[in-house]
Amino acid sequence: MPNLRGIRDRIKSVKNTQKITKAMRLVAAARVRRAQEQVLAGRPFADRLVGLLFRLRSRLRFEDVQSPLMERRDVQKVLVLVIAGDRGLCGAYNSNIIRRTVQYLRELQQQGKQFALYLVGNKAISFFRRSNFPIAKTLTNVDPNTPLEGANQLITDDILAPFLSGEYDQVELVYTRFVSLISSRPTVQTLLPLDPDALGQEDETFKLITKGGGFEVLREKQQVRTEPEFAADTIFEQDPTQLLDALLPLYLTSEVLHALQESSASELAARMTAMSAASDNAKKLLSTLTIVYNKARQASITQEILEVVSGANA
């Protein structure tokens, strides 16, 4: 016969765990909304920056512009920037980004290229420190909600210096693209050299909305507004090439920030999903334990009645 006290203790433990998972789910949902607000708040600056760069490129299209950030070289060594999480309890988020990174590194090895890793997040650091892949730099406790003094500027500085010095010929970014609350996509993107033809492409923003008593993600395409080109007789106080060289690092910083925000939203959405599943499992387990407890209690009462009746008959 099951121990009634043991079952009661287990039911109490499951209820406490369920409270924790529900709270973590709500916290993750609130942080996804905050990440959404950060993306929308930074969008006007990014739009104007891209628009200005597009106009400068159009003005300089007939000139031989040699910006060091757009210089394409024979790729011999690649710096791979990997953005993962600092904590667990977020489903397969960290394992997916690590798996995609390892796959990409194997591809570089097959091509005979050298590489080094720039790891962001404790989970990626702990995994790759146990591997044989070379690590150039690590960064933890990243907060993408501080765009001016935050990690995006630090990361940009860390990848710009070795690229401009020729230590690395290319910088690749591996991050998690936020698709929906139940879906994310590990993505590989070239950060450096910058592609001038990609400046006018479409971008997307995400918005967390409530629907049917739950949460849903609405993604919206944002067409970059390309303002009218500079007039042919426009006089610049500085050389347009110098302006381009000054604005390109800002564009790179905004790209890094965007990747941090997408990765952060993906991690939080994965944590929401994981905690929601844990809460549902706890509910099912409570139902099962309650049935077991009631059956055990009923059997115990029946046994006591039988003992009383047997004693009376004796």
From Swiss-Prot:
GO cellular component: plasma membrane; proton-transporting ATP synthase complex
PROSITE patterns per record: ATPASE_GAMMA
Pfam families: ATP-synt
Segment forming the signal sequence: none
Subcellular location: Cell inner membrane
SUPFAM superfamilies: ATP synthase (F1-ATPase), gamma subunit
Example GO molecular function: ATP binding
One example of a Gene Ontology biological process annotation: proton motive force-driven plasma membrane ATP synthesis
Membrane is among the record's keywords: yes
Keyword Membrane: yes
Keywords (A to Z) from UniProt: ATP synthesis, Cell inner membrane, Cell membrane, CF(1), Hydrogen ion transport, Ion transport, Membrane, Transport
Membrane topology summary: Peripheral membrane protein
InterPro entries registered for this protein in UniProt: ATP_synth_F1_ATPase_gsu, ATP_synth_F1_gsu, ATP_synth_F1_gsu_CS
Family affiliation: Belongs to the ATPase gamma chain family.
HAMAP family recorded: ATP_synth_gamma_bact (MF_00815)
Stated role: Produces ATP from ADP in the presence of a proton gradient across the membrane. The gamma chain is believed to be important in regulating ATPase activity and the flow of protons through the CF(0) complex.
Subunit-level organization: F-type ATPases have 2 components, CF(1) - the catalytic core - and CF(0) - the membrane proton channel. CF(1) has five subunits: alpha(3), beta(3), gamma(1), delta(1), epsilon(1). CF(0) has three main subunits: a, b and c.
Descriptive protein name: ATP synthase gamma chain
Phylogenetic placement of the source organism: Bacteria, Bacillati, Cyanobacteriota, Cyanophyceae, Gloeobacterales
